[in-house]
């Protein structure tokens, strides 16, 4: 089980990561990682950002049948 400090340190070392990758790296359940990231965000230590993947061929994401599949939420330290 990871601690809040370990999550912060991993973000500091990697720069930007998504919650799934943090969960895998620290061998910690996803709900716990999400809770810790939300806590870091509330403390003003981390921020979430949306990243658009470059796999969109049509350019019309609003009407895309994939919905939000081309969006990825990443976290970084402030």
UniProtKB/Swiss-Prot annotation:
Binding site for iron-sulfur cluster: 56, 61, 64, 70
Stretches that traverse the bilayer: none
SUPFAM superfamilies in the record: Winged helix' DNA-binding domain (SSF46785)
Top-level taxonomic group: Bacteria
UniProt keyword terms in alphabetical order: DNA-binding, Iron, Iron-sulfur, Metal-binding, Repressor, Transcription, Transcription regulation
GO molecular function, one term: iron-sulfur cluster binding
Pfam families in UniProt: FeoC (PF09012)
Protein family membership: Belongs to the FeoC family.
Matches recorded under HAMAP family: FeoC
Main function: May function as a transcriptional regulator that controls feoABC expression.
Name under which the protein is recorded: Probable [Fe-S]-dependent transcriptional repressor
Organism: Cronobacter sakazakii (strain ATCC BAA-894) (Enterobacter sakazakii)
Lineage start: Bacteria, Pseudomonadati, Pseudomonadota, Gammaproteobacteria, Enterobacterales
């Amino acid at each position: 089980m990871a601690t809040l400090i370990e999550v912060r340190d991993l973000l500091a070392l990697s720069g930007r990561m998504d919650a799934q990758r943090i969960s895998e790296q620290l061998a910690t359940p996803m709900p716990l990682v999400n809770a810790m990231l939300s806590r870091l965000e509330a403390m003003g230590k981390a921020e979430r950002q949306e990243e658009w993947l470059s796999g969109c061929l049509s350019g019309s994401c609003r009407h895309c049948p994939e919905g939000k599949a081309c969006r990825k939420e990443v976290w970084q330290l402030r």
